[in-house]
C-alpha cells in the first residue's frame, strides 16, 4: 500500500482555502493573514507511506506453508542479524522494519487460517469429571474426601495421638 499526500504550497492544493480529501481523511486549508501585511502564509506538508513488504514469505525466507514455529524461528534469526543494536550497516533499520512488517503479515494470515479451521464442541456440564456429592460415581468423591469426614458424621476413624 502506498499513500502520498501534499498539502498547501504549489503542490496538490495550490490555492489557499481550497479543500480536498484523501482515502481516509479530509483536510481544509485556510488563509492566514498577518496583521498589517497582505502576505499569505502558505505551508507545504508532504507525507508518504509505503509498505515495502512485497512478498512477506520471501522477506522472511520461508515457504508459504510454513508453520507458526518455523515463522517465529526465521523471524528471530533475521531479527538477530538486522537489529539496529547489532547491525552496523546503513540500511539495517529499514531492513529490520521490513522484517517486522513481514512477520506481522504472515502471523495474521496463519491466525486467520487457524480460526477458520477450529471446531468448537458445546460445553456439557454433566460431562465434567468431578461434580462433588452430585457425581453419579460418588465412590470416587468419598474415597478422595472421606478421610476428612465428607458425607459422614462419624469421626471415630481419626486418631489423635496427643489427646
UniProtKB/Swiss-Prot annotation:
In the record, the note on similarity to other proteins reads: Belongs to the DnaJ family. C/III subfamily.
What is the protein name for this chain?
Answer: Chaperone protein dnaJ 8, chloroplastic
**Which key words tag this protein in UniProt?**
Chaperone, Chloroplast, Plastid, Transit peptide
Asked if Transcription is a keyword of the record, the answer is no
Q: Which Pfam families match?
A: DnaJ (PF00226)
Source species of the chain: Arabidopsis thaliana
Any single GO BP term: response to light stimulus
Q: Does the keyword Hydrolase apply?
A: no
Domain (J) ranges: 55-127
Residue range of the transit peptide?
A: 1-46
GO cellular-component terms in the record?
Answer: chloroplast; chloroplast stroma; nucleus
- What compartments host this protein? Plastid, Chloroplast
Q: What is its main location?
A: plastid
What this protein is reported to do is described as: Plays a continuous role in plant development probably in the structural organization of compartments.
